[in-house]
């Protein structure tokens, strides 16, 4: 019986009779079962923490009146975005750790790449919008309610999603218009553009340039918005006479600046580096960091030193405790 080909072997043999790949196989770090079980448990714990942490921020932001301000609305959208971003990648990855059949359909791969690109790009724009929000709140606090009214922050959030969907659509259509007539094995835990281009049998030079310029433009624009916003914030801090006022500003901006540095630092390391330093394993590790690990870290970063969020969570817990006692 051991000499009979497995289902996966039969599928690979059938590929020779077709001109186009209709399914992909996701190849992760290792084929050793014990290691895969460990990775399954590790990333399951990370995913559960991501869900609990981010939804634990969304609920008080929605339910607590004291958090009904643009700054916390942006944070709530970011937390919801992180849940979506992680959910696009993690469940399929967890299944593949334990499953013998690690395949994903052509349409499923395109959908996963489109959603991951959409949520990842939206996070870039949203972090820039949050920097502008903090600039308005600190540099001109008396006009904050006017400068950051629903007529301003709702279009900012909407535009972030619309621009990201457009960006993701262009890259997804361009990538899956290529021919995949050779190997169908993707050395990655999810469908991402670089490993897909690596297995295409078409000329990918134009698409690689398109991808580089699009990602580079988004990074430059969003980072510039962050830098300009924090430049004005720094000027406002230097004008402050109160040490308590400076402490509040650092507390308000420190978490966001940390989140921006980690996220954009990872993206820049991923895409703005010499091609000679590219390896599929490094690509996989960095991709896991910004799609799975960062969404887990964000609730810690944004709530650890935020007294308003911690007080809102306490009020929510006390309120639920009293309701259960009635």
UniProtKB/Swiss-Prot annotation:
Glycosylation sites per record = 17, 101
Q: Which residues cross the membrane?
A: 38-58, 67-87, 112-132, 152-172, 209-229, 250-270, 284-304
Q: Report the GO molecular function annotations.
A: G protein-coupled receptor activity; odorant binding; olfactory receptor activity
Q: Which UniProt keywords apply?
A: Cell membrane, G-protein coupled receptor, Glycoprotein, Membrane, Olfaction, Receptor, Sensory transduction, Transducer, Transmembrane, Transmembrane helix
One Pfam family here = 7tm_4
UniProt keyword Protein biosynthesis, yes or no: no
Q: Which residues lie on this side of the membrane: Extracellular?
A: 1-37, 88-111, 173-208, 271-283
Q: Which GO terms describe its cellular component?
A: plasma membrane
State what this protein does: Odorant receptor.
GO biological process terms, alphabetically, are: G protein-coupled receptor signaling pathway; sensory perception of smell
> Under what name is this protein listed?
Olfactory receptor 5T1
Please give the PANTHER family that the UniProt record associates with this protein: OLFACTORY RECEPTOR
Sequence ranges on the Cytoplasmic membrane side: 59-66, 133-151, 230-249, 305-326
| Major place of residence | membrane
Cellular localisation: Cell membrane
UniProt topology in membrane: Multi-pass membrane protein
Q: Which family does it belong to?
A: Belongs to the G-protein coupled receptor 1 family.
């Amino acid at each position: 019986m051991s000499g009979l080909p497995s289902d996966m072997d039969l599928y690979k043999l059938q590929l020779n009779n077709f001109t186009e790949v209709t399914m992909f196989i996701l190849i992760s770090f290792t084929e050793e079962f014990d290691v895969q079980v460990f990775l399954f448990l590790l990333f399951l714990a990370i995913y559960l923490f991501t869900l609990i942490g981010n939804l634990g921020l969304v609920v008080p932001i929605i339910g607590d009146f004291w958090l009904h301000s643009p700054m916390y609305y942006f944070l709530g959208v970011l937390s919801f975005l992180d849940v979506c971003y992680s959910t696009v990648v993690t469940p399929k990855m967890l299944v593949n750790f334990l499953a013998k059949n690690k395949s994903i359909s052509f349409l499923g791969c395109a959908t996963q790449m489109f959603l991951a690109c959409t949520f990842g790009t939206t996070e870039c724009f949203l972090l820039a919008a949050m920097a502008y929000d903090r600039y308005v709140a600190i540099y001109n606090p008396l006009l904050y309610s006017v400068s950051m009214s629903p007529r301003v922050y709702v279009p900012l959030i909407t535009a972030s999603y619309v621009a990201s969907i457009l960006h993701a659509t262009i890259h997804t259509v361009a990538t899956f218009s290529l021919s995949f007539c050779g190997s169908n094995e993707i050395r990655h835990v999810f469908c991402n553009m670089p490993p897909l281009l690596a297995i295409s049998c078409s000329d990918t030079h134009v698409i690689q340039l398109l991808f580089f310029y699009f990602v580079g433009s988004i990074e430059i624009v969003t980072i510039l918005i962050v830098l300009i916003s924090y430049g004005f914030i720094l000027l406002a801090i230097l004008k402050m006479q109160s040490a308590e006022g400076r402490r509040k500003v650092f507390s308000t901006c420190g978490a966001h600046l940390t989140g921006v540095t980690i996220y954009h630092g990872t993206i820049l390391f991923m895409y703005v580096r010499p091609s000679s330093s590219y390896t599929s394993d490094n690509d996989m590790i960095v991709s896991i960091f910004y799609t799975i690990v960062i969404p887990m870290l964000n609730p810690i970063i944004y709530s650890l030193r935020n007294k308003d969020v911690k007080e809102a969570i306490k009020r929510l817990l006390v309120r639920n405790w009293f309701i259960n006692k009635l």
